């Protein structure tokens, strides 16, 4: 005859055995065996009474490690197959569109969408020399074909061919031939320059085209940049471009086709910067292509860094120069400018500092300030300032005008 005490002891012993078996089973579950046969314990804490760590359930990792206060179950759900240094596969979840477009995911293992391995988009994407993706199965990017750049960058889903194979028709730009240019060390340089047609500019300004750098040729992937030098003219009223012929060629191409009418007021943006972002559609007047060359500098020019994957520098893309120089954190692609001739030999680094500025008109006085305010210099008056008399001596007309 069993006593009640013996029954309770039997029940307690059975419960203890069940608990011990559960603990043993949990211990086997926690223990992982790798390929070498050595056991590996779960590096994250197991807290049965706490909530499950959502970050661990999504990615299989936890940034807090052993200090996390949530539970980290040993067996992850079946729809999460995480591999170290790879993007997670989440079967049943929508496909990650960013991953299908670029082959990468900026969210990494924290992305909650599915990243299939057998998709074509998961393969490494080829990039052109500017840093834009080339997708042979997609149609060409219309914005890239017009402007030569793409504001979406690596996230664009369209095809971006190589610049020497593409055609850019923005602001009258056409396709650009390739030339064989080399460094002084013998390395082949990416050449996308052609011959520059003579721009139509007022007679008061003589454009002088020089090599992209007045001391050395920049390496491939770096854009030419000339350090700012002192100019004898006001920057606001007479903006000049850097010593880079690439920026000067860009200015000539951008200003090509701008309307010049005396009936309309002057375009303030054009007067301040020398270019107009509206192009032919601008309704204001653009008084000539104002390009002046700064005095030559004996300091070697700096170069702007090319940072593929970063947004393009707005100043460099619009005007051809960057005020931040080599410290700029944005991308400065070596864009192909049409009509640019680059010197194949290195110029002398120590040039003569005694040079004359390219402006041939004298300093304006009060009498001709009215003509200059309209943006059109009085060519007739400037040409009649000096004349040669019969005796060969130079006669100043200003003295004759003051005499009775």
From Swiss-Prot:
Under the heading Pfam families, the entry gives:
zf-CCCH
Outline the segment boundaries, as ranges, of region: Disordered. 350-404
Q: Does the keyword Magnesium apply?
A: no
GO molecular function per UniProt: DNA binding; mRNA binding; nuclease activity; zinc ion binding
Chain intervals with Basic and acidic residues compositional bias: 377-391
The record's keywords, sorted A to Z, are: DNA-binding, Hydrolase, Metal-binding, Nuclease, Nucleus, Repeat, RNA-binding, Zinc, Zinc-finger
Question: Which SUPFAM superfamilies does this entry report, sorted A to Z?
Answer: CCCH zinc finger
**Recorded GO CC terms:** nucleus
Q: Where in the cell is it found?
A: Nucleus
User: InterPro entries, per this entry?
Assistant: Plant_ZF_CCCH, Znf_CCCH, Znf_CCCH_sf
Cite the residue ranges of zinc fingers (C3H1-type): 47-75, 90-118, 135-163, 261-289, 307-335
Role this protein plays: Possesses RNA-binding and ribonuclease activities in vitro.
This protein is called Zinc finger CCCH domain-containing protein 3
What's the source species' lineage? Eukaryota, Viridiplantae, Streptophyta, Embryophyta, Tracheophyta
């Amino acid at each position: 005859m069993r006593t009640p005490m013996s029954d309770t002891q039997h029940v307690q012993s059975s419960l203890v055995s069940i608990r011990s078996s559960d603990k043993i089973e949990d211990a086997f579950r926690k223990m992982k065996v790798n390929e070498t046969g050595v056991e590996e314990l779960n590096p994250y804490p197991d807290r049965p009474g706490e909530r499950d760590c959502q970050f661990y359930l999504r990615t299989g990792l936890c940034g807090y490690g052993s200090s996390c206060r949530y539970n980290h179950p040993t067996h992850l759900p079946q729809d999460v197959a995480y591999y170290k240094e790879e993007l997670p596969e989440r079967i049943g979840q929508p496909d990650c569109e960013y991953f299908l477009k670029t082959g990468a995911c900026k969210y990494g293992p924290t992305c909650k969408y599915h990243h299939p391995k057998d998709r074509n988009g998961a393969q490494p994407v080829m990039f052109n020399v500017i840093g834009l993706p080339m997708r042979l199965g997609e149609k060409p990017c219309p914005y890239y074909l017009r402007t030569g750049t793409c504001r979406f960058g690596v996230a664009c889903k369209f095809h971006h061919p190589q610049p020497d194979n593409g055609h850019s028709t923005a602001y009258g730009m056409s396709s650009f031939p390739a030339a064989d240019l080399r460094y002084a060390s013998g390395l082949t340089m990416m050449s996308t320059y052609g011959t520059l047609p003579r721009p139509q500019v007022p007679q008061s300004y003589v454009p002088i085209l020089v090599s992209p750098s007045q001391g050395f040729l920049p390496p491939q992937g770096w854009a030419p940049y000339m350090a700012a030098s002192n100019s004898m003219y006001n920057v606001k009223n007479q903006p000049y471009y850097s010593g880079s012929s690439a920026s000067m060629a860009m200015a000539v191409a951008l200003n090509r086709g701008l309307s010049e009418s005396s009936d309309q007021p002057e375009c303030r943006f054009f007067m301040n910067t020398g270019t107009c972002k509206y192009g032919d559609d601008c309704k204001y007047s653009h008084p000539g292509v104002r390009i002046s060359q700064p005095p030559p500098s004996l300091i070697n020019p700096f170069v702007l860094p090319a940072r593929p994957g970063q947004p393009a520098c707005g100043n460099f893309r619009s005007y051809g120069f960057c005020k931040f120089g080599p410290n700029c954190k944005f991308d400065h692609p070596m864009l192909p400018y049409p009509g640019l001739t680059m010197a194949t030999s290195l110029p002398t680094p120590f040039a003569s500092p005694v040079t004359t500025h390219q402006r041939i008109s004298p300093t304006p006085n009060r009498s001709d300030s009215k003509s200059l305010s309209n943006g059109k210099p009085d060519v007739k008056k400037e040409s009649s300032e000096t004349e040669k008399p019969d005796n060969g001596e130079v006669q100043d007309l200003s003295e004759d005008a003051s005499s009775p």
